[in-house]
Structures are given as structure tokens and as C-alpha cells.
Regions:
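Short, acidic, Ser/Thr-enriched surface-loop or helix-capping motifs
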Residues: 147
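Short loop/turn and low-complexity linker motifs enriched in small/turn-promoting residues
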Residues: 19-138, 144, 157-197
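Active-site nucleophile-His-acid catalytic modules used for acyl/amide transfer and hydrolysis
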Residues: 154
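Sec-dependent bacterial lipoprotein signal peptides
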Residues: 1-22
Length: 197
């Protein structure tokens, strides 16, 4: 009887935590002034609300390499938490709808949207690190984007057997129903500093 009274609260807590994590991500809408004449918007995807791609505004590859390029370690992991997708009102895409509806426990994407100055270069610094007692996996890459006035972009970090990538697509204005298609956006990859992993 003692074992049951001890195990019952533990089992109940585990069951409730599973219900909590199976919920869809919350969309938090932020009121941010936006002028399509001289600004652009970015939706940057991450994991479990954590930034896998860091945006460095008003920066070229050269400026980034001097300051930010050397110090960047990002370990992802830890216990799952409530996921919030931060929106400034960008149009929906197939990817954003999929992320909004995701209820994954082991792996779940999230995003944050930003209003940025148009015509000024920024650097998208993507990194992912995992560490166990037997191995360390790290991959880092960076790319420069000069957002154009009134344009919307999506940014995603991806990994494969050959390395990693920061992919940038433009959200096209012609909607297909409620969803907007995307197309490739021009970026320039930054050389990695020698002191970076």
C-alpha cells in the first residue's frame, strides 16, 4: 500500500506533463511599428523557443567576423518547456502553419519574427551543439542578407551529414488561399573565423 501511495503522485505528474507538452505552441502577437517603405520583416526558426540562428543587425560578414564570429557557443537541450511563437504580423506560409500546429515532445520547432531596417546588411549566425559523455557535435555557419523594403523573409538552420546551412527564402506576395509561397533569397556566406568551431 505504501508503494502505491508513493507511485500514484509520480505517475499523475508524468501524465500531466505529457498533456502539457502535447499542446500546440502559443502564438504571441506583438504590436511593432512597420513601414514597408524602409523596413523588412524576418521570421527566424529555432527549436523549443531557443535561438539556433542569431541575427546581428547592421553588420557585414567582415564586421561580424571581427566581433561576434569568435564567441559563439550554443548548446541546445534541457527539459522541454512551453513554446511561444512570437509574431509581428507576417503572412502565413506552409512552414509557419506546420510549426504552429506542432505538438511534438522530442523535437519541436518555434519561431520569432522581427522588423528590421531595409537596405542594410545583417548577418545570420547559425550554430548547433550537442554534447554527451562520449561525443561532441558542433556545426556553425553564417550568411549575410540585405533585406529589401517591404519584403518578408524566413530563415532556417539545417544540419546534414556534410555540415550545416542557413537557408533564407522570401515570402512571395501572391497568396494561395491563406498561405503564401516562398522563393530563394540572395545571401552571401561568411568565411568562418579561425577561432570559431
Amino acid at each position: 500500500m505504501k508503494k502505491i501511495s508513493v507511485l500514484l503522485p509520480i505517475c499523475a505528474a508524468l501524465a500531466l506533463s505529457g498533456c502539457f507538452m502535447s499542446q500546440k505552441s502559443q502564438i504571441v502577437r506583438r504590436e511593432v511599428p512597420y513601414n514597408a517603405q524602409n523596413q523588412a520583416r524576418l521570421r527566424i526558426y529555432g527549436q523549443y523557443g531557443r535561438d539556433v540562428v542569431r541575427m546581428i543587425p547592421n553588420s557585414t560578414c567582415e564586421q561580424w567576423a571581427e566581433k561576434q564570429g569568435r564567441r559563439h557557443t550554443r548548446f541546445t537541450g534541457g527539459p522541454p518547456r512551453r513554446i511561444r511563437n512570437l509574431s509581428v504580423g507576417m503572412p502565413a506560409t506552409q512552414r509557419s502553419n506546420t510549426v504552429n500546429a506542432d505538438t511534438g515532445v522530442v523535437f519541436r520547432e518555434s519561431y520569432k519574427e522581427f522588423v528590421v531596417p531595409a537596405g542594410k546588411a545583417l548577418v545570420l549566425d547559425g550554430a548547433f551543439s550537442t554534447e554527451t559523455t562520449s561525443q561532441v557535435n558542433r556545426c556553425r555557419t553564417a550568411a549575410s542578407l540585405t533585406p529589401q523594403p517591404g519584403k518578408d523573409y524566413e530563415v532556417q538552420y539545417s544540419r546534414s551529414g556534410e555540415g550545416c546551412d542557413v537557408a533564407v527564402v522570401e515570402i512571395l506576395p501572391q497568396a494561395e488561399g491563406d498561405l503564401h509561397p516562398t522563393g530563394p533569397a540572395p545571401i552571401q556566406y561568411c568565411p568562418m573565423p579561425a577561432t570559431s568551431y
